[in-house]
């Protein structure tokens, strides 16, 4: 029998998220009508942008728009940069005031919150679900979806608490005693310590700050009152804590790279406005904003001659100034040699003159810098390291000629290799430990190349490879506490070059 169609579930053709069964159309559905037209689907463009690790400011649609605006201005397009106003943010009552105390001001530079009462937690409207679905986020409920929407729009992570969990009507930002047990939203138990920042009520922690919420403190269908959080946490604290607990979320991804320290209030107001519109809530307190030491813009002195030399082309002072101002850098002083700039605090990657030049060249266009007719170079003289590298290559080529294959393993290794073996000549006390391990399996630097080589052998055997002959060139690392001293603690650490077969 010839088949002119196919049976589909909702998620297979993009009209829903259900995969429970096939779509059954009513009898009056017009035969031959395009499915997109029948389901009132609108076409849209999804642009995937690779953001480099240093561009934390671009981890949101607003940040990308800022860059696009600067490029359009540079290329002669008449355009403007604007975002929704906060005029609709109006405090309805003072029924649910929340106090805030920051005990650890190093880890938490700013913390703001607002309470919303009489909310109806329910499914988000279709337009909001569509916007989240198209960027790969799963809709949960209207309150949680609003926080995710604001995060993706402006790059500021938010968190929402059930107000009933905020006992004492007070939020305290602090670390916990070593060994404190905490269960996250996914039901996993974690052990907190003095290096883990947490958001607490008057009695207990409710959330691992900037990373993961606690079980029972989230927003559910029975929730009526919520507290919205908008904060700035120190990137290093969040990064180390996330690695320590093996947690990675959209929020931690942004916090550990550095969010805009002056964008918390705008994001909080926009979220509160949406809560009123989509959940019928009432704003029940003035925004509580604790910001002990406001973070300042970065002062940078940029000389025109330096910029032209680094770019490799004289693009002119006016072009430099126009691009700098379009990137929201303020010119505070100008003379014949250059300009004094204030770089926005959200540009954590632009703190030196060379960083400013890189930003200017990026907007000006690398392709607009012509290749010069003369290229400058410097003479180099081979030293002992070059000779050693040459000798290493000769040996490697000889081994390859004999049928060996070169492997390259990670210098990071499992801690268990130095603790679980009964007859281990590489004691744990001599390993170089990593302060912020990428994972639980990569917690120390290797003392020997043996374990990495055996891993490669095992992996290849499991893939049915035969006649395995490997060699590897690399370093091993050793810690000798007997050589440690306060005057020169680095003497306790050493590395050696090895070739293993």
Language-model features: locations:
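Extended beta-strand-rich architecture
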Residues: 124, 144, 266, 270-274, ...
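Residues forming anionic-ligand binding surfaces in small-molecule and nucleic-acid pockets
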Residues: 32-52, 95-134, 235-255, 293, ...
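Short, glycine-/Ser/Thr-/acidic-enriched flexible segments
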Residues: 1, 12-14, 52-56, 66, ...
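Phosphate-backbone binding interfaces of nucleic-acid-interacting proteins
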Residues: 1-90, 227, 250, 258-261, ...
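Glycine-rich, small/acidic residue-mixed loop/short-helix segments
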Residues: 216-269
């Amino acid at each position: 029998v010839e088949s002119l169609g196919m049976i589909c579930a909702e998620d297979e053709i993009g009209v829903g998220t259900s995969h429970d069964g096939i779509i059954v159309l009513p009898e009056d559905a017009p035969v031959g009508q395009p499915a997109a037209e029948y389901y009132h689907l609108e076409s849209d463009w999804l642009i995937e942008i690779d953001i480099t690790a240093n561009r934390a400011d671009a981890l949101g649609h607003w940040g990308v728009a800022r860059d696009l605006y600067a490029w359009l201005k540079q290329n002669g397009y008449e355009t403007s940069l604007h975002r929704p106003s906060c005029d609709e943010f109006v405090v309805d009552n003072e029924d649910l005031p929340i106090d805030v105390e920051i005990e650890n001001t190093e880890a938490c530079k700013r913390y703001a919150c607002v309470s919303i009462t009489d909310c109806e937690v329910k499914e988000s409207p279709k337009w909001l679900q569509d916007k989240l679905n198209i960027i790969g986020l799963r809709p949960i409920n209207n309150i949680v979806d609003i926080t995710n929407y604001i995060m993706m729009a402006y790059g500021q992570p938010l968190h929402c608490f059930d107000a009933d969990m905020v006992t004492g009507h007070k939020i305290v930002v602090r670390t916990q005693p070593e060994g404190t047990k905490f269960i996250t939203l996914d039901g996993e138990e974690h052990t907190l310590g003095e290096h883990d920042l947490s958001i607490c009520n008057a009695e207990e922690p409710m959330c691992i700050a900037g990373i993961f919420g606690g079980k029972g403190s989230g927003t559910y269908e029975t929730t009526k009152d919520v507290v919205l959080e908008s904060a700035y946490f120190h990137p290093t604290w969040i990064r180390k804590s996330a690695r320590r607990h093996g947690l990675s979320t959209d929020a931690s991804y942004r916090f550990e790279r550095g969010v805009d320290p002056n964008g918390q209030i705008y994001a909080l107001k926009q979220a509160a406005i949406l809560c009123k519109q989509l959940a019928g809530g009432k704003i029940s307190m003035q925004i509580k904003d604790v910001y002990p030491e406001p973070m300042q813009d970065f002062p940078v002195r940029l000389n025109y001659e330096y910029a032209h030399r680094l770019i490799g082309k004289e693009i002119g002072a006016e072009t430099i100034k126009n691009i700098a101002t379009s990137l929201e850098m303020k010119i505070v002083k100008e003379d014949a040699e250059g300009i004094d700039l204030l770089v926005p605090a959200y540009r954590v990657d632009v703190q030196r003159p060379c960083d400013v030049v890189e930003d200017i060249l990026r907007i000006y266009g690398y392709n607009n810098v012509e290749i010069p007719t003369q290229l400058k170079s410097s003479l180099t003289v081979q030293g002992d390291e070059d000779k050693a590298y040459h000798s290493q290559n000769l040996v490697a080529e000889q081994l390859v000629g004999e049928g060996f294959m070169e492997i390259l393993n990670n210098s990071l290794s499992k801690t268990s290799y130095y603790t679980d073996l009964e007859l281990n000549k590489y004691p744990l006390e001599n390993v170089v430990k990593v302060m912020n391990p990428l994972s639980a399996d990569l917690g120390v630097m290797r003392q020997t190349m043996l374990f990495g080589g055996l891993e490669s052998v095992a992996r290849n055997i499991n893939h049915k490879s035969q006649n395995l002959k490997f060699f590897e060139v690399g370093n091993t690392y050793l810690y000798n506490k007997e050589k440690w001293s306060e005057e020169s603690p680095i003497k306790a650490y050493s590395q050696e070059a090895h070739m293993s077969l």
